[in-house]
């Protein structure tokens, strides 16, 4: 976003507007615009667009109206992205996870469901590829389930509202599969269950989304999301029984697929295509490492 301040009375102090996410550039004449590398890199055609036929008051009115129109459109886009929406997919995923845990528990065959749906390297290599996805809906115990569902509710309801239902679902499922694949590659003889790989994927997607909207989410990303990821990964290395490979695979997969599905109003088609290509390469690499290496 380019904001222009007119210093008509010598009262504009640019230092007031400088933050980690905002760069203030002082311009006295047209030549200053052409010399500034930052402006030229972000707005390569700004010099051409600043050429007007109007002069004096007419030029001032035209520039003011253009800026107001542009800011209004930007505000409408931001409102569209950040206005809360009902997180239907998040609720559906939570319900499925609860059903998969409690129904077989009440029926007395919980261990069988875990054995049939969990990710286990030898069975996956025998052709039971469905386990790579179904493992994300199975949990070892009630504490495991409640912890993951709380995390899914907190993170999912925000991210789904930001990026939309279909993007959210694609990121979630892709992250779950990537997490299972890396888990099979690193610990092939361990039974892996849980939604944490997919949830880490949501965190990876939130990182990329937050980068594009860093003027609004920059502080949250740096003070909350990144520390949360780092702390949980460190715990995964220190506490036995945690499948950190699934966490890392999901985190990377979620970030890459978020690039592929794109951030509304921010991502170009070029970025989306590159994101999908890199996601496919990463997926193929994981398949090779898990099934053929």
Residue spans for each PLM region:
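C-terminal ends of transmembrane helices
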Residues: 152-160, 207-215, 259-265
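Alpha-helical membrane-inserting segments
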Residues: 99, 103, 178, 182, ...
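Alpha-helical transmembrane segments that form the membrane-embedded catalytic/substrate-binding core
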Residues: 145-152, 193-205, 243-261
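Membrane-embedded catalytic cores of phosphoryl/pyrophosphoryl-handling enzymes
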Residues: 214-215, 220-230, 235-236
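Hydrophobic alpha-helical transmembrane segments in multi-pass integral membrane proteins
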Residues: 234-246, 284-293
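N-terminal TM1-TM2 helical hairpin plus the immediately adjacent luminal interfacial "cap"
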Residues: 87-196, 237-242
């Amino acid at each position: 976003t380019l904001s222009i301040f007119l210093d008509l009375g010598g009262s504009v102090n640019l230092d007031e507007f400088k933050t980690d996410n905002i760069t203030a550039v002082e311009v006295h004449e047209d030549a200053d615009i052409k010399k500034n590398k930052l402006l030229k890199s972000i707005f390569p055609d700004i010099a051409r667009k600043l050429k007007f036929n109007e002069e004096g008051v007419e030029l001032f009115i035209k520039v003011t109206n253009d800026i107001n129109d542009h800011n209004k459109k930007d505000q409408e886009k931001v409102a569209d992205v950040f206005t809360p929406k009902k997180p239907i997919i998040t609720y559906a995923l939570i319900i499925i996870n609860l059903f998969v845990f409690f129904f077989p528990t009440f029926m007395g065959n919980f261990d069988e469901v875990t054995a049939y749906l969990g990710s286990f390297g030898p069975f996956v290599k025998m052709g039971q590829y469905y386990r790579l996805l179904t493992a994300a809906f199975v949990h070892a115990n009630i504490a495991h389930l409640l912890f993951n569902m709380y995390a899914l509710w907190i993170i999912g309801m925000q991210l789904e509202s930001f990026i939309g239902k279909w993007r959210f679902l694609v990121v979630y499922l892709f992250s779950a599969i990537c997490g299972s694949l890396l888990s099979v590659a690193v610990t092939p003889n361990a039974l892996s269950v849980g939604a944490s790989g997919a949830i880490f994927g949501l965190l990876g997607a939130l990182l990329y989304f937050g980068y594009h909207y860093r003027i609004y989410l920059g502080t949250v990303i740096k003070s909350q999301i990144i520390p949360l990821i780092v702390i949980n990964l460190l715990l995964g290395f220190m506490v036995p029984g945690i499948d950190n490979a699934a966490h890392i695979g999901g985190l990377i997969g979620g970030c890459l697929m978020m690039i592929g599905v794109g951030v509304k109003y921010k991502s170009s088609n070029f970025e989306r295509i590159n994101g999908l290509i890199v996601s496919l390469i990463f997926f193929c690499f994981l398949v090779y490492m898990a099934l053929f290496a």
